[in-house]
Amino acid sequence: MIFGIGLDLVELEQIRQTLERQPRIVKRVLTAEEQNRFYTLSDKRQLEYLAGRFAAKEAFVKAFGTGIGADVSWLDLEVLNEASGRPVMTGPFEGTIHLSITHSDHYAAAQVLLEKRSSDVSTNLDRN
């Protein structure tokens, strides 16, 4: 059963400007493991990587129904890649997190679908 769907779109230029003004954003948004990967990339790929993770985490909190900082922090969420390149998100959700990330020359976007097993979902149906 679908619990929530979230979508986020960010401009790479906005992320680039933020990164130049506030380099600490890397440590605020990316987990230690994500940072390890980030620092192995070229400047162009670093920008795409950071923007994609930023969008993915924003999409998660939209699907979860909260905002960053309220119940979920940036570092509660982690996006790593399988050997195939498929991004996999882990976070404070008891169910399956489906994630898709894409980017172009100017934008990065992510979509998150949160899925719970039907047995995990309580209902208030009247069974008369």
Curated annotation (Swiss-Prot):
One of its GO terms (cellular component) is cytoplasm. GO terms for molecular function: holo-[acyl-carrier-protein] synthase activity; magnesium ion binding. Gene3D superfamilies: 4'-phosphopantetheinyl transferase domain. It is an enzyme of class 2 (transferase). InterPro entries: 4-PPantetheinyl_Trfase_dom, 4-PPantetheinyl_Trfase_dom_sf, ACPS, Ppantetheine-prot_Trfase_dom. It is found in: Cytoplasm. Its cofactor is Mg(2+). One of its GO terms (biological process) is fatty acid biosynthetic process. Its EC number is 2.7.8.7. Keywords: Cytoplasm, Fatty acid biosynthesis, Fatty acid metabolism, Lipid biosynthesis, Lipid metabolism, Magnesium, Metal-binding, Transferase. The keyword Lipid metabolism applies. Mg(2+) binds at D8, E58. It catalyses: apo-[ACP] + CoA = holo-[ACP] + adenosine 3',5'-bisphosphate + H(+). It comes from the Bacteria. Belongs to the P-Pant transferase superfamily. AcpS family. Transfers the 4'-phosphopantetheine moiety from coenzyme A to a Ser of acyl-carrier-protein. NCBIfam families: acpS, pantethn_trn. This is Holo-[acyl-carrier-protein] synthase. The lineage of its organism: Bacteria, Bacillati, Bacillota, Bacilli, Bacillales. The gene is acpS.
